[in-house]
């Protein structure tokens, strides 16, 4: 009897474990009430108390109600969609926005799989707020021509990968922020409270093209308030073509730009702000193992406007058409720059203030051969 009871208890325990391991069925957004797909997604999330996957089926949807995704829930829900789900945002705010939840901490929020199309009046496609652990992947984000495809505001330790981001003002813009310490929490450059910089953001394996301002823009919209620079962000393996500008770091520390494909942008890699002083400087940026197609319309592949301890190595280029003053690297203000082992084939490897040459010795910089 004891053996039978033990076996029965063991089998019930295993069945309970199996039931707990079974994934919860996705909730179709179209099954919820609402005025449009944005409103329906919001209602579906409320119905399951943020404890489910809300799924957007294939279809063409027009919506003006912003999708609100609450942060700090640590992996209890996600927003997923079919690749054939096309969401056309007609509003003037953020198509998908996040809000800080009832407690601080990680979110483990996942947004994936569908197409998000904007309009010239929209602020952004996806607006991420301060938290840890958000992933945006396998998305198409296009047409936010007056704003940002993805706006990263004070977010930490998050991943943006394998997306097509095109025809936006900025593909991905990262900004610091300050948030109130009392609820309801408000964040913004004019708010008094706790500072959040964008740190450890990993932007990898995306195609970011035809941005009218920048493909990737670390924008220092506010300094002071105890804010640090944007720290140790990673931009790797991206295809950055035909943008007005590719990557611009205004105020950063330890950012890595690696193994990207650059072609056809008016400006490619820009480090620091002209005459910005220490408040707007790139500290310790690493620009490594990237490829550049060099053309006349892009005078410089890498611009060091104001940087300290920049490391530039292992990059290569294919020279198409060049002008007499094209330079692989143009330096305005820098200290302790290390440039080596780059496969440079154009006439001028280095320029100082737009004129072929290097800074005078004594600033701690090292410049090695072109090839």
For each predicted feature, which ranges?
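Boundary at the C-terminal end of the N-terminal hydrophobic targeting segment
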Residues: 17-23
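Short glycine/acidic-rich loop motifs that flank beta-strands on beta-rich extracellular proteins
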Residues: 64-67, 83, 88-95, 119-125, ...
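Parallel beta-helix/beta-solenoid
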Residues: 75-83, 96-144, 204
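Intrinsically disordered, low-complexity Ser/Thr- and acidic-rich flexible linkers and loops
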Residues: 177-197, 222-228, 275-281
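Leucine-rich solenoid repeat scaffolds
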Residues: 331-371
């Amino acid at each position: 009897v004891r053996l039978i009871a033990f076996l029965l208890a063991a089998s019930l325990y295993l069945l309970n474990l199996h039931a707990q391991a079974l994934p919860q069925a996705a909730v179709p957004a179209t099954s919820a009430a609402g005025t449009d797909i944005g409103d329906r997604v919001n209602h579906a999330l409320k119905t399951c108390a943020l404890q489910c996957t809300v799924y957007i089926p294939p279809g063409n949807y027009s919506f003006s109600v912003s999708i609100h995704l609450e942060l700090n829930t640590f992996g209890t829900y996600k927003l997923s969609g079919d690749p054939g789900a096309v969401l056309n945002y007609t509003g003037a705010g953020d198509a998908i926005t996040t809000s800080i939840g009832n407690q601080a901490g990680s979110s483990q929020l996942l947004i994936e799989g569908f197409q998000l199309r904007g309009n010239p009046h929209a602020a952004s496609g996806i607006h991420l707020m301060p938290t840890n652990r958000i992933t945006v992947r396998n998305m198409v984000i296009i047409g936010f021509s007056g704003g940002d495809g993805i706006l990263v505001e004070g977010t930490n330790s998050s991943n943006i990968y394998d997306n097509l981001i095109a025809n936006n003002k900025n593909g991905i813009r990262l900004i610091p922020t300050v948030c109130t310490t009392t609820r309801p929490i408000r964040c913004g450059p004019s708010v008094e409270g706790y500072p959040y910089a964008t740190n450890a953001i990993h932007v990898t394996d995306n195609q970011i093209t035809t941005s009218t301002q920048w493909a990737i823009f670390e924008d220092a919209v506010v300094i002071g308030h105890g804010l640090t620079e944007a720290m140790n962000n990673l931009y790797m393996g991206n295809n950055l073509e035909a943008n007005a500008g590719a990557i611009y770091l205004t105020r950063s520390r330890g950012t890595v730009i690696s193994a990207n494909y650059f072609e056809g942008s008016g400006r490619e890699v820009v480090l620091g702000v002209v005459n910005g002083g220490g408040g707007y400087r790139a500290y310790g940026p690493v620009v490594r193992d990237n490829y550049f197609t060099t053309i006349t319309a892009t005078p410089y592949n890498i611009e060091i406007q104001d940087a300290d301890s920049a490391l530039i190595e292992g990059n290569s280029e294919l020279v198409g058409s060049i002008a007499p003053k094209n330079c692989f690297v143009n330096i305005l203000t820098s200290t302790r720059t290390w440039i080596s082992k780059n496969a440079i084939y154009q006439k001028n490897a280095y320029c100082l203030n737009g004129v072929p040459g290097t800074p005078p010795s004594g600033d701690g910089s090292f410049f090695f051969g072109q090839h």
